[in-house]
A protein has these predicted regions:
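Glycine-rich phosphate-binding loops of nucleotide-dependent enzymes
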Residues: 2-186
Length: 186
């Protein structure tokens, strides 16, 4: 198994609060990995640190054999590592299509239309709402939009932070079915 992501002894602080204490793990190519812990255990902080939104005081993070120590978050996305943040965090005043296009900032214009179709195939509901502003979507639709936006960057690793938070059980089932299908598709 090839290691695609390696997190080694990272320590993250919020001011004087030691939020992440020496966490280490590896993700192999093709693996699905879950971070499990109580509220406040540091799961979101860990994902945000890997994505370059926070910095570790010590330790290292390597993606595909390259250090991410001083790499800005937008370049981490361009390398193939995308985060779907907790709470969806879509651009509420922008349309569905505009939100998806924001996720394609790493792509050349020629491929964006094809990428949009790929996302619309995964999430047909988004195609029905492509001109609608994201703020008017349901929670489940916003989660689909956040996932679709991340997929527009062609990630090699897709990190999902609380993908089922606040969703009805039927929507949770749909989201996890899509995650399984993405895993099978590679």
């Amino acid at each position: 198994m090839n290691t695609i992501l390696k997190v080694d002894d990272i320590n993250v602080y919020y001011g004087s609060i030691h939020a992440i204490k020496g966490i280490s793990f590896e993700v192999g190519e093709g693996e699905v990995v879950t971070l499990i812990g109580a509220n406040g255990a540091g799961k979101s902080t860990t994902l945000n640190t890997i994505a370059g939104l926070l910095r570790s005081k010590t330790g290292s993070i390597e993606f595909m054999g390259q250090s991410l120590a001083k790499v800005p978050s937008h370049k981490i996305v361009a390398k193939g590592l995308a985060l779907v943040p907790e709470g969806r965090r879509v651009f509420l005043q922008m349309t569905v299509q505009e939100n998806l296009e924001m996720g394609a900032f790493t792509q050349k214009n020629a491929g964006i239309a094809q990428d949009l179709e790929m996302v619309y195939d995964l999430f047909p509901r988004l195609k029905e709402r492509l001109k609608q502003t994201a703020g008017t979507l349901s929670g489940g639709e916003q989660q689909m939009l956040a996932m679709g936006r991340a997929l527009m960057s062609h990630p090699k690793v897709l990190m999902l932070d609380e993908p089922s938070m606040g969703l009805a059980p039927i929507l949770v089932e749909q989201i996890f079915e899509i995650i399984q299908n993405l895993h099978k598709a590679g």
